[in-house]
């Protein structure tokens, strides 16, 4: 039986870029370029006729640009979309992530005229790998909106107190809790058992949902009773997504010390949207630093950082060399470097060979965090192809840290979390929307 071809539609107004893309994509026998459109309008007209499996779109095009085109595709006939961008101007890299916010899956640098030799071969292999991945991803017809989580407020006599803090647990009400699985997985506790809640691993047909809108996030202090503010008087996240600039909070009160000292998150394909969905739910007074590792094409990291900064209450930045991680910040490794720690707990960069094909590597940083923080670490492994992060998550788990893997139904690509689960490295297996409440709950219970 012949293997089904991967049908690709190119939507690109640059003749040079289109020629290079067609040359690359027509090379392997399992991929077929079924059309090339010069604008978003032309692309929309072609989709019902050519029935692509994957769409490659430019950012800037006449008549209808990439953002409007992506929004229309996701509303009318959702397909996996790869954004092709030159990523030269800072405003362009930021706009690229607006396309991901609208439903595109991944980004890739636009081929340049005159690229030859080793540079062309690397570009070719990376593009073909992305197309093969995107041909099998889960596409959500709408962006999944995360429910705005309520501020944590003092309660009395409800039985919901955790850790003796007098703050309400983020456990859902009984009417919303999952029923126990009739056949729980061996060695794992089923939901509703009163012990650790682990969502069963399964393939589910989920209805169209939204993925990571911009709700207000939680505050970790006691509720003040003022709407729109948390207990510490801090705003509940970035409630207005158009206001990217953060107000400095030099004297913002922080929570009591928690026994967890760091949160680390790894992601690949589909990761920018998943990171936005989690980080936008965490408040500015989040009590531990966050270290994220995201596989992303060269040239797009700063755009990702800038976009997340506009979406989150926390400050997002590239990890500065020789600086100690601090609460209130989200750190990313620089492009092309592993991120680790020196003996004093300060950030160090490494040019060691790629691990699981990646530098920066999730596993390298997870291993460094396991060695440095041990049981004081929380780790989350999100959507992505391959197995990077699985061994590192096992290191954190074996060191006594808390580990969470995104579940299959909410992953764009169920690869990295699946590998971690197969190793027994994930203590929790959860939908993306359930991860922020669990993180907050565990932080509170450790105070």
Explain the meaning of each model-derived region.
Residues 165:
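Walker A/P-loop phosphate-binding element recognition
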Residues 2-9, 15-30, 41-42, 48-49, ...:
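Conserved acid/base catalytic micro-environments in cytosolic active-site loops
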Residues 38:
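Acidic, two-metal ion nucleic-acid-processing modules in DNA metabolism proteins
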């Amino acid at each position: 039986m012949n293997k089904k071809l991967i049908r690709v539609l190119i939507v690109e107004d640059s003749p040079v870029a289109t020629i290079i893309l067609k040359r690359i994509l027509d090379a392997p026998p399992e991929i077929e370029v079924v059309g090339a459109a010069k604008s978003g309008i032309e692309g929309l007209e072609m989709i019902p006729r050519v029935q692509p499996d994957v769409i490659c779109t430019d950012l800037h095009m006449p008549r209808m640009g990439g953002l409007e085109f992506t929004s229309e595709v996701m509303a009318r006939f959702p397909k996996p979309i790869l954004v092709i961008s030159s990523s030269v101007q800072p405003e362009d890299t930021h706009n690229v992530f607006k396309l991901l916010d609208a439903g595109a899956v991944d980004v890739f640098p636009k081929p340049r005229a005159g690229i030859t030799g080793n540079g062309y071969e690397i570009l070719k292999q990376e593009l073909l790998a992305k197309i093969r991945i995107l041909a099998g991803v889960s596409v959500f017809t709408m962006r999944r909106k995360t429910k705005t989580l309520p501020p944590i407020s003092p309660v009395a006599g409800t039985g919901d107190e955790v850790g003796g803090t007098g703050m309400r647990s983020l456990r859902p009400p009984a009417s919303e809790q999952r029923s126990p699985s009739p056949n729980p997985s061996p060695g794992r506790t089923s939901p509703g058992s009163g012990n650790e809640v682990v969502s069963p691993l399964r393939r589910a047909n989920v209805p169209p949902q939204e993925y990571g809108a911009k709700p207000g996030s939680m505050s970790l202090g006691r509720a003040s009773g003022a709407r729109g503010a948390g207990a510490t008087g801090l705003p509940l996240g970035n409630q207005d997504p158009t206001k990217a600039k953060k107000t400095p909070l030099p004297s913002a009160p922080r929570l009591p010390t928690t026994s967890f000292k760091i949160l680390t998150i790894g992601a690949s394909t589909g990761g920018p949207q998943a990171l936005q969905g989690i980080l936008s739910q965490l408040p500015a007074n989040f009590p531990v630093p966050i270290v994220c590792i995201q596989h992303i094409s060269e040239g797009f990291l700063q755009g990702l950082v800038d976009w997340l900064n506009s979406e989150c209450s926390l400050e997002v930045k590239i990890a500065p060399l020789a600086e100690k991680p601090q609460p209130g910040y989200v750190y990313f490794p620089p492009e092309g470097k592993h991120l680790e720690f020196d003996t004093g707990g300060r950030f160090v960069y490494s040019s060691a060979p790629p691990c699981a094909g990646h530098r920066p590597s999730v596993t390298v940083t997870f291993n460094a965090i396991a060695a440095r923080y041990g049981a004081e670490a929380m780790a989350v492994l999100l959507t992505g192809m391959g197995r990077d992060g699985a061994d590192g998550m096992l290191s954190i788990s074996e060191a006594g840290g808390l580990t969470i893997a995104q579940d299959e139904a909410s992953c764009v690509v169920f690869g990295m979390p699946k590998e971690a689960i197969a190793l027994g490295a994930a203590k929790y297996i959860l939908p993306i929307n359930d991860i922020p409440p669990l993180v907050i709950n565990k932080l509170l219970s450790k105070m």
